[in-house]
Amino acid sequence: MRGTIVRVSAVAAIVGAALALAGNLVHPRGGDDPDFEVYQRFAHSTSLRIADLILIVAIILLTVAVVGIARSLEGADLEVFARLGAMFGVVGGTIAIAQFGLESYAYRLQSQVFEGARRPDVRSAFWAANAVDHVNNGLFITWTLVFLGIAPFVIGLGMARSA
């Protein structure tokens, strides 16, 4: 059973990593450009939704991999690391999916509203897009900390203890 979990987790990790790489290569960038230019670029982006869809599938596969690797830790003294690592993996993956969904729908939609706003509405449309942008960034920072930081750290501690 343990061998099957490890193999499935390894395949999920490999495919998820390849999809994450592809999704990030396709994803439009904001860079250090002024916010209004970024919103205009995202309003016209044809690759944002495709990239986010690819990244959602990647995160699902990587979450499966993290949970499987965590569950492969055996021994009573390692159970806490396995459970915490799996929990942080699921929590981080869930936040990531929410962030990609928000970005793909609300961020792009509000950028389009800003782009098409008439003169009297430009300021409020900008600040609405800016608010969605800040929520999107907050979710991104949170899931990267939990999914790419805490989950592998806890699982790594368990693996180091098992060696």
Give residue spans per PLM region.
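Hydrophobic, aromatic-enriched alpha-helical segments typical of multi-pass transmembrane helices
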Residues: 1-163
